[in-house]
């Protein structure tokens, strides 16, 4: 799920719904990839690749979220983060997400450009976005059933509990329950999550 809006990415150059590396309808991410691609949420690169196993960075995630939200980014012309160039491909998206309270930085002055986003951070950002959009986030799953419950950061537990209940997150292992909160999100996983998120918006 990495490589979102790479500098080399060419939007709408390739035929719609056609990625050379997403061709098997039996793959768990197949429908989600084409769902998101058809709506302009996540694009491929100039080689016609979606890169389903690619890692997603923090700035790539907020760019996708902005697309999902249909955000008007034209008014976001400045940012407090010293590692974000407002005229970059992600600058206004980061400013939008931060200004509206969806995402914070990794420190007071740094957003964390180039850092991969993990599952608990993704859940937290979506949770904040959902709250501010008036989506009911009151129903939450019992996270103590997961073997790595103790590894979930305290600041993300409510968000993760909501995300699990909403079907956005689940166990990363089919043999036992493990939430893997620190695991980096892939492009394929992001496509699946955003397709599911659309159903509860």
Model-derived features: positions:
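Non-catalytic cell-wall polysaccharide-engagement segments
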Residues: 187-189, 194
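A short amphipathic alpha-helical interaction element
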Residues: 33-36, 65, 97, 126, ...
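Feature responds to low-complexity, polar/acidic, surface-exposed segments characteristic
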Residues: 2-30, 43-59, 66-92, 99-120, ...
């Amino acid at each position: 799920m990495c490589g979102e809006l790479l500098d080399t990415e060419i939007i709408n150059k390739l035929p719609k719904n056609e990625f050379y590396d997403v061709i098997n309808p039996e793959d768990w991410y197949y429908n989600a990839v084409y769902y998101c691609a058809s709506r302009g949420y996540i694009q491929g690169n100039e080689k016609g690749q979606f890169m389903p196993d690619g890692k997603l960075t923090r700035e790539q995630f907020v760019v996708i979220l902005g697309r999902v939200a249909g955000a008007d980014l034209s008014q976001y012309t400045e940012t407090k983060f010293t590692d974000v160039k407002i005229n970059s491909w992600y600058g206004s998206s980061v400013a939008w997400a931060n200004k509206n309270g969806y995402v914070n930085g990794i420190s007071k002055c740094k957003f964390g450009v180039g850092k991969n986003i993990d599952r608990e951070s993704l859940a937290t950002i979506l949770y904040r976005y959902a709250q501010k959009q008036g989506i009911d986030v009151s129903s939450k799953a019992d996270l103590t059933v997961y073997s790595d419950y103790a590894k979930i950061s305290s600041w993300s537990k409510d968000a993760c509990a909501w995300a699990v209940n909403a079907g956005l997150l689940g166990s990363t292992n089919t043999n036992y329950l493990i939430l893997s909160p620190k695991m980096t999100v892939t492009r394929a996983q992001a496509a699946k999550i955003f397709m599911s998120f659309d159903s509860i918006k």
